[in-house]
Amino acid sequence: SLIFGVEHTSDELTSDRFSGNANHDLKTRALKETEYFLQDEWTINPKWMVSAGLRTNFSKAFGFMGMPKIAAKYSPNERWSIRANYSMGYRSPSIKELFFNWDHLGMFMIRGNENMQPEKNNYFSLGAEYSNDRLFLSGTAYGNYFRDKIEGVWRIYDMQYNFEYTNLSKQRLLGLEALLRWHVLDCLTLNGTYSFVNVSKNEGIQVNTTSPHAATASLDYKFTKKNYRLNAVFSASYMGRKKFDVQDRVFVEEDNKSYDAYFRCDLPQYVLCNLSVSQTFYNKVKLTLGVDNIFN
């Protein structure tokens, strides 16, 4: 099957919080992009399927970019599937990332960067899936290699925190993702996800604030009888410990000048657990009760 499409995006933002606007006059910034995409899927035989495509992006601000994509799926039987993917990606900076200059009540600043360039990436993945009447499992390993990665970086100067957007020359993400859905009983379902990501440093500095480990789990119970439905969900989310570097300015008396320096932020891991119970009577009245962050 052959798929062709066109997508046009036109963003406009009117604000008094743009850079270079000391008088805080209302100004409008705009970005426009047009994308064309073409994709074809080919079923070679009952076990093999291949798809290939091309996406192009054009904007007056950043010019033309072409991005290929290819994917293959192998299904040795009805329960197993193996997938491999490659795609090239592209993202232009947003109006906020380019032009914003926002003061949050003197506590911190968000600063755009008009000199930023679009980020580009090459994405590779290999995954497997298994399913039967009650169980679905999937796992994926991936690598994402960026050039001119758009990143928000915390810096401190003028006695204030500043969140600034910038291009990183290169960044590499390696990750694993796993998903579980198990119908333990007809009325009881267990869901779970886990992700691991390793982000490269930028000249020895870890500016990315993503946690390496994250997981979610939920247990869903459903009960139904005439004119009544009960649904109870217990869910938990885990966010692992994360470390990243924040830029500061350090004054050196011997040199009588200040230099950029970094200090390490170390945020602990945490778990959030929620419980929600909903009851529906006669398909007309629904009562929901819930507790967020149960154990804290």
Report residues per predicted region.
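Residues on the lipid-exposed face of transmembrane beta-strands in outer-membrane beta-barrel proteins
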Residues: 1, 38-40, 70-74, 126-130, ...
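Gram-negative outer-membrane beta-barrel transporters
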Residues: 43-47, 142-145, 165-246
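Outer-membrane beta-barrel signature, preferentially recognizing the C-terminal barrel domain
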Residues: 75, 81, 88-146, 156-183, ...
